[in-house]
Structure formats: structure tokens, C-alpha cells
Swiss-Prot record:
Location in or out of the cell: Cytoplasm
Transmembrane helix listed as a keyword: no
Subunit structure: Part of the RNA polymerase complex.
Protein name per the record: DNA-directed RNA polymerase subunit Rpo6
Catalytic activity: RNA(n) + a ribonucleoside 5'-triphosphate = RNA(n+1) + diphosphate
SUPFAM superfamilies (UniProt xref): RPB6/omega subunit-like
Record NCBIfam families: PRK01099.1-3
Function, in words: DNA-dependent RNA polymerase (RNAP) catalyzes the transcription of DNA into RNA using the four ribonucleoside triphosphates as substrates.
Pfam families documented for this protein: RNA_pol_Rpb6
A cellular-component GO term for this protein: DNA-directed RNA polymerase complex
Length: 60
């Protein structure tokens, strides 16, 4: 697996898009404690664990 270095803008876009998906009812991919209910916090945890199913395609 290739790990890309993301810019802060790409990171914000990925976390924001995933948080929106979670807020709209998408299933959470990882197990989290029941007291974490904020979609942004959940998306950040998923991002840190590298499990967000979103890919980045850059134009070169």
C-alpha cells in the first residue's frame, strides 16, 4: 500500500466528506466508544487509523 503525504486541505476535505457521510447515516467502519457521537470526531478517528474508504487522485 502506498501512503501519500496529504496537504492540510486534502486532509480537511477527506475528514469533512466522511463526517458528512456519517451524519447522513453511513455505517461507522471502526469500533468506537458509545460516548463519541460527533461525526467529525468519528471521521478523525477513522482518518488516524487509515480506514476511510476515500481515495485521492491528483492531476499531474
Amino acid at each position: 500500500m502506498i501512503f501519500m503525504i496529504l496537504t492540510k486541505f486534502e486532509k480537511a476535505r477527506i475528514i469533512g466528506a466522511r463526517a458528512l457521510q456519517i451524519a447522513m447515516g453511513a455505517p461507522v467502519i471502526i469500533d468506537i466508544s458509545p460516548d463519541i457521537i460527533d461525526p467529525i470526531d468519528i471521521a478523525m478517528i477513522e482518518f488516524e487509523n487509515n480506514v476511510i474508504p476515500i481515495t485521492i487522485k491528483r492531476n499531474q
